[in-house]
């Protein structure tokens, strides 16, 4: 079967009911990527090569090209790796056409201490083998997630037992991100907290390094998954901010934009691109899908892939499983979800003061504690008989009762001196599942530059 684009080469895969050869398909993905890169005037000024004109001199144009810095959060999954490869192609084409480039790229690779050696090996291979031609304008940084939180101020967040109010106190306890995540019993909550921590560090790095655009490697499948997951978790108010690619990120000083250049590309298409571009050897902790290829080379692997039990899956994994099932035949379902969600506006706040959640750093529009208090019974039923009173006194005199009463009294004493710690509804629900409704969580105000600098990969290493 011939490729429908060039009509000369043999087709190797089918996507969106169209047959592609490898070269035409790679071009198809590249064009969708470029379209999002140049979506508005701001992005055009960041990505294109600037020359002297009536607005700037040649020296000013060169300086602006150097100051056009974009940040790529790299997970070494298929999406972020494909995006970095497409960016590298763009830089190479600019260098060939203009003998210069229009922007600089900073790449941040986050991982836990146990994964650092393998991540560094893959990053060094990627830098020397795939990015060597543009090594002067692509710099890679490794960030140890555990070490990044070991030096910052830690707050203990407390959730009230009776009215769902929240407070925070400073604590001298040392914490790594791994120990913070261990406070949660459910994988879904741990994944949420890991994403909030990773996102905060990336955006903090962007605000400290004059970054103009953060390029997130989310496919349209991942974005649809994220939209549905936010609704399920009670975080629907965050959808508008999550998908906003036009406004500046006000939570971090309105210094940069968040861009999703692969938002028109399906995850299966990104996986196919990685296979065609021979990026498999750089992928970490992810298996490529081969569902689009006419002669799939990994049919056996796909057939033997273990399907986890639903009760062991996170909310994101459950929604991803659904979208994986419908992506091939009903891809319009996925794009419709993202397109509809992109039309949502920011919620209207009840007050004039701008308040941010102490955990996820998203804006709080309505105080969830007041709403929860209005729909729940918050007080225990009092003893109704002498027998009830006798049983209560027996419990109070028991070791378990004394321990509980002492803990509640200590918590009450702390509560009276603790500071306000606003939480969004989703984080109230998450904090409610922790032991004693307490959570050690890092302060937003800390500098990640020192930790990043220690792991910067340079040409000499």
UniProtKB/Swiss-Prot annotation:
Swiss-Prot/TrEMBL GO biological process terms: invasive growth in response to glucose limitation; protein urmylation; pseudohyphal growth; tRNA thio-modification; tRNA wobble position uridine thiolation; tRNA wobble uridine modification
InterPro entries in alphabetical order: CTU2, Rossmann-like_a/b/a_fold
Top-level taxon: Eukaryota
Chief site of localization: cytoplasm
Recorded GO CC terms: cytosol
Keyword Cytoplasm: yes
Molecular function terms, GO-annotated: nucleotidyltransferase activity; sulfurtransferase activity; tRNA binding
Compartment(s): Cytoplasm
HAMAP family hit by this protein: CTU2 (MF_03054)
Purpose: Plays a central role in 2-thiolation of mcm(5)S(2)U at tRNA wobble positions of tRNA(Lys), tRNA(Glu) and tRNA(Gln). May act by forming a heterodimer with NCS6 that ligates sulfur from thiocarboxylated URM1 onto the uridine of tRNAs at wobble position. Prior mcm(5) tRNA modification by the elongator complex is required for 2-thiolation. May also be involved in protein urmylation.
Family per similarity comment: Belongs to the CTU2/NCS2 family.
Name of the protein: Cytoplasmic tRNA 2-thiolation protein 2
Species per Swiss-Prot/TrEMBL record: Eremothecium gossypii (strain ATCC 10895 / CBS 109.51 / FGSC 9923 / NRRL Y-1056)
Lineage summary: Eukaryota, Fungi, Dikarya, Ascomycota, Saccharomycotina
Gene name of the record: NCS2
């Amino acid at each position: 079967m011939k490729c429908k684009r060039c009509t000369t080469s043999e087709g190797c895969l089918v996507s969106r009911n169209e047959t592609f050869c490898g070269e035409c398909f790679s071009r198809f993905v590249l064009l969708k990527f470029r379209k999002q890169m140049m979506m508005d005037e701001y992005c055009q000024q960041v990505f294109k090569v600037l020359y002297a004109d009536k607005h700037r001199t040649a020296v000013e144009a060169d300086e602006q090209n150097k100051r056009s810095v974009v940040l790529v959060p790299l997970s070494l999954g298929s999406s972020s790796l494909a995006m970095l490869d497409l960016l590298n192609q763009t830089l190479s084409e600019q260098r060939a056409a203009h003998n210069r480039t229009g922007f600089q790229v900073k790449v941040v690779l986050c991982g836990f201490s146990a994964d650092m050696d393998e991540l560094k090996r893959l990053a060094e291979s990627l830098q020397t083998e795939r990015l060597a031609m543009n090594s002067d304008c692509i710099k890679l940084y490794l960030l140890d997630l555990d070490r990044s939180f070991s030096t910052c101020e830690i707050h203990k967040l407390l959730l009230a037992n009776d009215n769902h109010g929240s407070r925070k106190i400073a604590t001298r306890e040392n914490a790594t991100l791994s120990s913070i995540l261990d406070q949660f019993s459910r994988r879904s909550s741990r994944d949420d907290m890991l994403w909030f921590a990773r996102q905060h560090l990336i955006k903090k790095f962007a605000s400290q390094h004059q970054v103009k655009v953060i390029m997130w490697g989310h496919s349209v499948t991942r974005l649809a998954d994220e939209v549905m997951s936010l609704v399920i978790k009670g975080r629907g108010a965050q959808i508008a901010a999550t998908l906003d690619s036009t406004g500046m990120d006000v939570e971090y000083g309105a210094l940069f934009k968040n861009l999703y250049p692969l938002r028109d590309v399906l995850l299966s298409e990104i996986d196919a691109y990685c296979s065609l571009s021979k990026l498999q050897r750089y992928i970490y902790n992810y298996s490529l899908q081969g569902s689009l290829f006419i002669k799939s080379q990994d049919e056996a692997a796909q057939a033997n892939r273990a399907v986890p039990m639903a009760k062991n899956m996170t909310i994101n994994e459950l929604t991803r499983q659904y979208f994986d099932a419908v992506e091939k035949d009903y891809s319009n379902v996925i794009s419709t979800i993202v397109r509809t969600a992109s039309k949502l506006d920011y919620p209207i706040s009840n007050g004039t003061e701008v308040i941010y959640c102490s955990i996820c750093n998203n804006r709080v529009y309505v105080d969830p504690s007041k709403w929860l208090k209005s729909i729940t019974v918050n007080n225990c039923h009092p003893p109704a008989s002498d027998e009830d009173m006798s049983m209560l006194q027996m419990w109070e005199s028991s070791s378990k009762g004394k321990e509980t009463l002492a803990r509640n009294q200590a918590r009450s004493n702390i509560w009276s001196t603790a500071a306000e710690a606003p939480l969004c509804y989703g984080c109230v629900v998450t904090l409610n599942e922790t032991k004693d409704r307490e959570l050690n969580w890092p302060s937003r105000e800390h500098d990640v530059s020192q930790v990043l600098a220690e792991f910067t990969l340079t040409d000499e290493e």
